[in-house]
Amino acid sequence: MSLNDTPSAERVHIGFFGRRNAGKSSVVNAVTGQELSVVSDVKGTTTDPVLKSMELLPMGPVVIIDTPGFDDEGALGELRVKKTKQILNRADCAVLVVDATQGLTPADQELIALFQEKDIPYLVAYNKSDLAAAPQLGEKELAVSAVTREGIEELKERIARLTRSQGEDKRLVGDLLTPGDLVVLVTPIDSAAPKGRLILPQQQTNRDVLDADCTAIVVKENTLAPTLEKLAVKPRMVITDSQAFAQVDRDTPKDIPLTSFSILMARYKGFLEDAVRGVAAIDRLQDGDRVLIAEGCTHHRQCEDIGTVKIPRWLGEYTGKNLRLEHSSGRDFPEDLSPYQLVIHCGGCMLNGREMDYRRKTAADAGVPFTNYGITIAHLKGILKRSVELFPDLYALLP
């Protein structure tokens, strides 16, 4: 994906599920108008989830996911079914492809139960309608044929209706601004920064400021103080990369609100309150306690990486405890969090809302406090209250 494309996390994720040879891959190819997936009469041709980011009318930017057969067998088959279940954790919408010549099976019914359990909007597409008539169709059902394309346009329209309202009103920072406001963005550029570009949360925040008809000034942490002195207008707020919190707090006058990209991202993803409540667990940590530090992506680690170097160092300095720190990255996230006393997650800019919510709920179900990098660093640096003063309800939660 190029830097000009919509980020994967901001695309609607549409998963196609079903038994082997129900025609999932054929339906996916018909919907996308591309040979996205290999098609064969051999059962189990799709052995791993196939993901494709694309623009698909009338939905717009989407990620299409073709999954292995849910009735796969054997040791490898069980692993494929497990991968299919993992896809459910990020699916904004599900399409169950059923072989119309065979009808609904127990495996199909199990998938429907999983959709309902996870509150995933779904449709049931009876494929091969050119070979057999579908049963009497319910509200969520329709007949399609990947061969003749019967029902394919209707399927696309109905998927669009299911997903149309998702994320429409979400803003990173624009809802906190009034047109004409001035916002200062602090973006450190160190050995861990990507070459030639800003990281995704910084890009997205900058764009949201502009979309709100406001002015963004982008500076490094070592030029913040002189920049503020030159301004004739007081900024509405200063937004910083969390790792520079301590210096930016010192250099930003107390009458200017201060927060971080990570904190705004937690709010955008819907778990900021959980993060604020969860960070208090740091003060209860004891020697030997297990802490999971989780990343949503698999970027190359540098010598001063925030997740594997800086946060562990600051945790040790703050708590004085001998903690057992463990790390996960990308899609590798533990299903059982009960052994941990705390989960510290990144901002989640590379994860869509569904997957971020799944991770938060997994921690909640295990009774494990869940927080994120920005809130953690603000707490460790003693500026948590200041970092959330833009959000009065959360500010009131803190002593």
Pin down the residues of each PLM region.
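Long, well-ordered amphipathic alpha-helical subdomains in the mid-to-C-terminal portions
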Residues: 176-204
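Conserved C-terminal guanine-recognition region of P-loop GTPase G domains, centered on the G4
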Residues: 52-60, 75-143, 171-175, 198-214, ...
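Short, flexible loop segments at the rims of nucleotide/cofactor-binding pockets, characterized by
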Residues: 41, 70-76, 99-103, 162-164, ...
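Conserved hydrophobic helix-helix packing surfaces used for dimerization/oligomerization
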Residues: 14, 183, 289-291
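Canonical P-loop GTPase G-domain recognition
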Residues: 117-175, 179-184, 213-222, 259-260, ...
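C-terminal effector/interaction modules appended to NTPase cores
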Residues: 1-2, 19-25, 195-399
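G-domain G4 guanine-recognition motif of GTPases
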Residues: 67, 98-102, 120-136, 142-150, ...
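Conserved G1/Walker A P-loop phosphate-binding module
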Residues: 1-78, 82, 86-89
